[in-house]
């Protein structure tokens, strides 16, 4: 995958990116490192599911959970220099005064040990989620499941 010139954030993806999104979310080589956290989150919130919404010709990919929890997704696509596809995602929900990041995944090339580690994609994704949290009335903290059974809590600065 060529080096990305820019990242774009979106709550859904065009249907043609389904295979790439599934690979990043469900068949990611980095999952083994996070299995304890994934197991804990899925037990409480349900496993993530990629669903198709919209009418034929305008279908989009969204996330939900097996337990039907109301979640939102921050998909990240790389654009430029030949890259135009999903490279990351955060699935999150709101609980009282917190946005809770349930599942996070990045393409292996953009992981901390990938060939594009310098892009710091996970940090960019978390900053974007924090920016979203700042705009939501009543949200005071981010809770991040980063591979453990309990989330890390980060206070939102306004």
Cite the ranges covered by each PLM segment:
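Generic structural motif recognizing short loop/turn segments at the entrances and edges of beta-strands
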Residues: 1-9, 69-72, 83-88, 137-141, ...
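A conserved beta-strand-loop-helix scaffold within acyl/acetyltransferase catalytic domains
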Residues: 40-98
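Hydrophobic, Leu/Ile/Phe/Ala-enriched alpha-helical segments that form helix-helix packing faces
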Residues: 25-29, 33, 78, 125, ...
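Generic structural motif
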Residues: 12-18, 79-81, 109, 149
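Acyl-donor binding region in acyl/amide transferases
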Residues: 96-157
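Phenylalanine-focused residue identity feature
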Residues: 7-9, 26-27, 75, 92, ...
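Helix-loop element at the rim of GNAT/NAT acetyltransferase active sites that forms part
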Residues: 23-51
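Conserved N-terminal entry element of GNAT/NAT acetyltransferase domains
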Residues: 1-33
